[in-house]
Amino acid sequence: MPLLDSFTVDHTRMNAPAVRVAKTMQTPKGDTITVFDLRFTMPNKDILSERGIHTLEHLYAGFMRNHLNGSQVEIIDISPMGCRTGFYMSLIGAPTEQQVAQAWLAAMQDVLKVESQEQIPELNEYQCGTAAMHSLEEAKAIAKNVIAAGISVNRNDELALPESMLNELKVH
């Protein structure tokens, strides 16, 4: 099985909250697609609550689009990581980590302005697979933590696992 890009970086050395360019690729027509690792918590140290990350998923995608989309950038998708330490964001374009961090902070400020569960988009059984699993309070706590900590940048060259370690860790 091929090794996925996200598993070639040392999760024990990641900062959080932090932005990392996880992957960049070109479409056949020449457009740039960039995948960002938006790490909210330190891997293997903390996880986002299931209700908080789910509510954030509903709010964050829209708020990030409001702050980052433009003539050079269009967000394709923002999805929570299975490990519940952050989100992956795929987009057309190549914004800088600083632009993404600024949009992320602005989106967290927007989360704090949501006044009630009724203002959470698509929170109903027709548009959400687990409509009962939400907590605006927990989403706001996550947002407050990000704002208080600030957002740094994780760089692949600083986090790369050595080839010898990748071979040692390989599943046989």
UniProtKB/Swiss-Prot annotation:
SUPFAM superfamilies: LuxS/MPP-like metallohydrolase
Residues that coordinate or bind Fe cation: 54, 58, 128
Sample GO molecular function, one term: S-ribosylhomocysteine lyase activity
Pfam families the UniProt entry points to: LuxS
Catalytic activity field: S-(5-deoxy-D-ribos-5-yl)-L-homocysteine = (S)-4,5-dihydroxypentane-2,3-dione + L-homocysteine
GO annotation (BP), single: L-methionine salvage from S-adenosylmethionine
UniProt entry keywords in alphabetical sequence: Autoinducer synthesis, Iron, Lyase, Metal-binding, Quorum sensing
Database matches in InterPro entries: LuxS_sf, Metalloenz_LuxS/M16, S-ribosylhomocysteinase
EC assignment: 4.4.1.21
Cofactor: binding comment: Binds 1 Fe cation per subunit.
HAMAP family, alphabetized: LuxS
Assembly and oligomerization: Homodimer.
The family this protein is said to belong to: Belongs to the LuxS family.
Stated role: Involved in the synthesis of autoinducer 2 (AI-2) which is secreted by bacteria and is used to communicate both the cell density and the metabolic potential of the environment. The regulation of gene expression in response to changes in cell density is called quorum sensing. Catalyzes the transformation of S-ribosylhomocysteine (RHC) to homocysteine (HC) and 4,5-dihydroxy-2,3-pentadione (DPD).
Full protein name: S-ribosylhomocysteine lyase
Organism whose genome encodes this protein: Vibrio cholerae serotype O1 (strain ATCC 39315 / El Tor Inaba N16961)
Gene designation per UniProt: luxS
